[in-house]
Design a protein with these regions (language model features):
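Short, contiguous strand/loop micro-motifs
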Residues: 8, 42-43, 103, 127, ...
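Soluble or luminal CAZymes and related metallo-dependent hydrolases
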Residues: 16, 51, 108, 184, ...
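Short hydrophobic/aromatic residue motifs in ordered secondary structure
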Residues: 32, 135, 302-303
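Non-catalytic C-terminal accessory region of glycerolipid acyltransferases
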Residues: 69, 120-121, 145-146, 169, ...
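Catalytic core of membrane glycerolipid acyltransferases/transacylases, capturing the structured
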Residues: 73, 80-83, 87-92, 122-183, ...
């Protein structure tokens, strides 16, 4: 018998690994997992030199850019960076809460110019552009429980199919569809267009450049310096010819509840092949501007632990 393809073997192993973590959390509880988290986070903080440097770079940039509005009283050091890592771990636990369907102990309040209830009234769906700032899973879980519109989440990591299968095993009522993609092609666009025409919504992040084509990016100022942003989500928005919204969900450090920012971006994004990047600037300016503002107010919820400005590669 011929050996299995490596992707098949890896996919099978990843399913059981994901299922084990979800089951352990489901029965072990939040606080037990939190006890395990502290040494794990400390280990990754001590051994992850590049991630630690990226954290310190970001926190210091926020402090310098914000000036008198800085969330820090002095330049952030290694203690602030460790706390940054710690918050990443805590948010990961709350993501699992959302995935397995546990009743949250927090509330989600709307702070944007649009509410999910307004989206329910529209005949068609739309594109929700988020980021790795905050916790989109909480927003997805809230929307899934309170509203009928289906959320299709595009992810650029491996094993989305395994995750979908494991999630259904733990929480059969889960109605979040993770769609694993390596590239945005016409076949994907056609499938998503059909779903949007049926009233569903597509969630995609816009702050990281393409895994397969990092050169397909567009630059915009962010925290005082030019940074590369993904081009794919905006091209997809143009192809889908649908309403576009920005979606951010961040934990308020004062009361532990979540602030949901759902903001209308445009009714339809038109990007001609000629001068595409110039035509994109108005909506990208709005997106980067809101991302920047929220990053200053919620700096510990910035979960891009890499050189976001690509300074090390210059």
């Amino acid at each position: 018998m011929a050996d299995k393809h490596w992707a098949q073997t890896d996919e099978r192993g990843s399913y059981w690994g994901i299922l084990f973590v979800l089951r352990a959390y489901q029965y072990g509880g939040h606080w037990l997992m939190r006890l395990v988290l502290a040494p794990v986070i400390t280990y990754f903080f001590l051994t992850g030199k590049a991630s630690r440097r990226a954290s310190q770079q970001f926190l210091r940039r926020v402090h310098e850019f914000a000036g008198g509005e800085s969330p820090f009283t002095q330049p952030p050091g290694w203690r602030k960076s460790w706390y940054h890592f710690w918050q990443f771990g805590l948010h990961a636990l709350e993501k699992i809460d959302a995935w397995v369907g546990k009743s949250p102990k927090y509330t989600v309040r709307n702070c944007g110019d649009t509410q999910f209830s307004e989206l329910e009234k529209r005949p068609e769906g739309g594109l929700l552009v988020g980021s790795h700032l905050g916790n989109l899973e909480v927003a997805r879980a809230m929307a899934g429980k309170k509203y009928s519109r289906r959320l299709n989440v595009l992810v650029f990591t491996q094993h989305a199919q395994s995750f979908n299968k494991a999630l259904k095993a733990v929480n059969p009522k889960a109605d979040i569809d993770l769609i694993q993609v390596t590239d945005i092609d016409m076949g994907l666009a056609i499938m998503l267009k059909e779903r949007i025409d049926n009233g569903e919504y597509v969630v995609i992040v816009g702050d990281r450049t393409s895994v397969t084509a990092p050169q397909q990016s567009v630059s915009h100022e962010f925290l005082g310096e030019s940074a590369p942003f993904a081009l794919g989500p905006w091209i997809l928005a143009s192809v889908l010819e649908c309403p576009v919204y920005f979606l951010f969900c961040l934990k308020n450090p004062e009361d532990g509840n979540y602030d949901l920012y759902l903001n209308f971006a445009c009714e339809q994004l038109k990007l001609p092949r000629k001068n595409r990047q110039e035509a994109l600037q108005p909506v990208l300016k709005k997106y980067a501007g809101q991302l920047e503002q929220l990053a200053i107010h919620y700096p510990y919820q910035w979960f891009n632990f890499f050189d976001f400005w690509h300074k090390d590669s210059q």
